[in-house]
């Protein structure tokens, strides 16, 4: 019986340390996300390679407009390659070549190189835009709903190149109001 109690206690401590280790403190990044809750998470793989794990957080209730997308990378990438891929994905969902190239250059101007285990987080707040964080530190703000819709559309637009990841992130819920998509 004592062995069972010790085992259960160790298991509980392990579970708590794991779950709090992956929790994000969005309130310290943006006060609009004080009550952010995980809505869904998933893994992006490409040709069998684990690229990153993504987690989608919503503020308060599901009709709230504020949200965050947190990505923990499992491969190393240059900031320029992340920016270029983002621009390509924006074109895939219908952004013009010219606009995607402009936004790609803007992303390339601040996105850092990432190593395995590091995080990039993007937070959307209406009338403010998208704020980017690297390892929890603010690195840039791109104002405007047009950019935000294009950037987050990489994951949430129905034409995404990663429909399985989209479904995992959204869970049983609708996309954020930014997308005006009927459920």
Each language-model region and where it sits:
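Bacterial N-terminal signal peptides
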Residues: 7-17
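Positively charged n-region of N-terminal signal peptides that target proteins for export
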Residues: 1-6
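Terminal leader/tail segments of proteins
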Residues: 22-134, 138-183
């Amino acid at each position: 019986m004592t062995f069972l109690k010790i085992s259960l206690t160790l298991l509980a401590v392990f579970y708590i340390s794991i779950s709090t280790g992956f929790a994000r403190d969005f309130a310290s990044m943006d006060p609009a996300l004080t009550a952010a809750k995980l809505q869904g998470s998933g893994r992006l793989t490409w040709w069998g390679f684990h690229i990153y794990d993504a987690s989608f957080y919503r503020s308060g209730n599901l009709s709230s407009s504020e949200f965050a997308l947190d990505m923990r990378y499992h491969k190393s990438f240059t900031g320029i390659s992340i920016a270029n891929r983002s621009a390509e994905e924006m074109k895939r969902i219908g952004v013009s070549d010219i606009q995607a190239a402009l936004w790609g250059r803007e992303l390339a101007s601040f996105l850092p190189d990432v190593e395995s285990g590091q995080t990039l987080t993007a937070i959307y707040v209406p009338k403010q835009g998208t704020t980017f964080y690297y390892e929890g530190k603010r690195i840039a703000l791109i104002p405007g709903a047009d950019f935000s819709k294009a950037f987050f559309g990489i994951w949430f637009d129905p034409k995404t190149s990663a429909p399985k990841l989209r479904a995992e992130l959204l869970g049983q819920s609708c996309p954020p109001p930014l997308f005006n998509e009927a459920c």
